[in-house]
Amino acid sequence: MKIIFMGTPEFAVPSLEMLINEGYNVIAVVTQPDKPKGRGKKLAAPPVKEFALEHGIKVLQPAKIKTPEFVEQIRELGPDLLITAAYGKIISKDMLDVPPLGCINVHGSLLPAYRGAAPIHWSIINGEKVTGITTMFTDVGLDTGDMLLKRELEISSDMTAGELHDEMAILGAEVLKDTLIHLKNGTLVRSPQDDALSSYAPIITKEVGLIDWNKTVQQVHNLVRGTNPWPGAFTFINESKMRVWKTCIVDFGNSQEHCPGEIVSVDDKGILVKCCDGYIMIKELQFDSSKRMKVRDYIRGNKIDTGEKLGK
């Protein structure tokens, strides 16, 4: 069985690694073009490309994947199966029709919930307690194809998007492995998705990280977790942008004498801030002029006053 693997970020690497370790014939990898990264804006290769080259696998990086020329290039390679994992672009019907076994996708949610580009982030931001991996046959819609296998994963109360991402990437490879075993044995069962139960997880932008202190304590805590490590939750103090990397919910009642966003106390434990229904403790922060640090380390050389208001 000849396989073409399509993926781009770190999430996809364990799935590709599994294919290699299990002896599958990966004849090519399709990944997105190198992109400028960091302050120097030097071109950086996608993690999937780096991994593929380390293992001597042919790498294709088309700027556009829907052109007749690229579809023909895939057809000439003669794959039996396409496998996608966080590739980042919708695949055309012409390409989906090339492999006789179709295209299997590894998706980071329990479909039909959280279709789209950022299911891991949004599952935390929205306060989900459980998420998981779904393998599916890809169709021309956005994560709308028939489901194959599902496996759940618990989201702990303080888990960040980065931590969940790493666990989901490993789980994705495991579920893909089982899916391919069923495919070879002819025991795959396809389950259509119920569109009435679907939800959408749009791409995460930097603006998503802006903290609204009029939200509940739990909502603010979830936003901080769900945007860590990217794009990062943030607020403003005296018009300076302050990133908030870690918070904890504290039992401090819900006094009406403080307004949302007000700093109630500052000490080695952290910065206590009022939300609409209670108080949250900022434990780690970062300003543009400094590195990420614990509050106790920051206040040794910098002053943050109680009574100040966070936000614009």
UniProtKB/Swiss-Prot annotation:
GO terms for cellular component: cytosol. It catalyses: L-methionyl-tRNA(fMet) + (6R)-10-formyltetrahydrofolate = N-formyl-L-methionyl-tRNA(fMet) + (6S)-5,6,7,8-tetrahydrofolate + H(+). Keywords: Protein biosynthesis, Transferase. Its EC number is 2.1.2.9. One of its GO terms (molecular function) is methionyl-tRNA formyltransferase activity. It comes from the Bacteria. (6S)-5,6,7,8-tetrahydrofolate binds at residues 109-112. PROSITE patterns: GART. The keyword Transcription does not apply. The keyword Electron transport does not apply. SUPFAM superfamilies: FMT C-terminal domain-like, Formyltransferase. Transmembrane segments: none annotated. PANTHER family: METHIONYL-TRNA FORMYLTRANSFERASE, METHIONYL-TRNA FORMYLTRANSFERASE, MITOCHONDRIAL. Attaches a formyl group to the free amino group of methionyl-tRNA(fMet). The formyl group appears to play a dual role in the initiator identity of N-formylmethionyl-tRNA by promoting its recognition by IF2 and preventing the misappropriation of this tRNA by the elongation apparatus. Belongs to the Fmt family. This is Methionyl-tRNA formyltransferase. It comes from Ruminiclostridium cellulolyticum (strain ATCC 35319 / DSM 5812 / JCM 6584 / H10).
